[in-house]
């Protein structure tokens, strides 16, 4: 798990971006 946490693509920023994208797609 620590490896995924260390990965830049698996960081909280990526999660927030994914949530934003999901919300935008849902609102479309």
From Swiss-Prot:
Top-level lineage group: Viruses
Keyword Phosphoprotein: yes
Protein name per UniProt: 71 kDa phosphoprotein
Subunit architecture: Interacts with the host protein DAXX; this interaction takes place at ND10 and induces the reversal of DAXX-mediated repression of viral transcription.
Keywords for this protein: Activator, Host nucleus, Host-virus interaction, Phosphoprotein, Virion, Virion tegument
Keyword flag NAD: no
Physiological role: Stimulates viral immediate-early (IE) transcription. Counteracts the DAXX-mediated repression of viral transcription. Displaces a DAXX-binding protein, ATRX, from nuclear domain 10 sites (ND10) shortly after infection.
Main location: virion
GO terms for cellular component: host cell nucleus; viral tegument
Cell compartments where the protein resides: Virion tegument; Host nucleus
Family under the similarity heading: Belongs to the herpesviridae pp71 family.
Region (Disordered): 1-28
